[in-house]
Amino acid sequence: MQTQEEMNVLVPEKLAEIERDYDVTVLWAIESGSRAWGFESPDSDFDVRFVYKHKQDFYLSLNDHRDVIELPIDDTWDVSGWDLDKALKLLYKSNPTLFEWLQSPIVYQQDSDFIDRIRPLVSQYFSEKKMLHHYLNTARTQMNKYLSGDKVKPKKYFYALRPILACRWIKNIILFHRFCLMIWSKNSSLMK
């Protein structure tokens, strides 16, 4: 298995290969999954996720096109990306996966202009209801799938706890922060 330091060199090479093979530009590439969450195991693969764009003519076509790039998965690599159009539509729908990608602590490649434009949209399209629904269902699925047997791998507990803690964070931190902003914007004397 490769180290993170080795992957910091190998991933940009893989992304350049994708750009050549698919005639796209990678705008944002990150690590997702257990490595981004801080609880990888020695046998964890690298979950590279990215957002890409095609040339303008691609978007002016009347034909439907595939909006994902997925490379074959092996013991080291799990690489997939979304077309910019798909990513923006999912952002509008408050898709938790894209929101998580934008918060990943491991960034392999980024277009600063893209990030400067998309980050402000996160708070605009963030839906507590959709996020809570997603994370509760994820927790339920993880618990039913991985925590019901006699022998449970410790890592599987993290996969069940993480979405529960995400719900708690959304309810306690995000909603409180929005509440404070609402009060402060309506009564600026509280800010003094």
Predicted features along the sequence, with ranges:
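Catalytic metal-binding acidic patch
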Residues: 33-72, 77
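Short loop/turn segments at secondary-structure transitions that flank enzyme active sites
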Residues: 52-58, 94-97, 141, 166
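A basic- and aromatic-enriched beta-loop-alpha substructure that forms the phosphate/nucleotide-
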Residues: 61-138
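A structural signal for short, well-ordered beta-strand segments and their strand-loop junctions
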Residues: 28-31, 100, 170-172, 176-177
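Helical scaffold of the NTase/Pol beta-like nucleotidyltransferase catalytic core
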Residues: 1-30
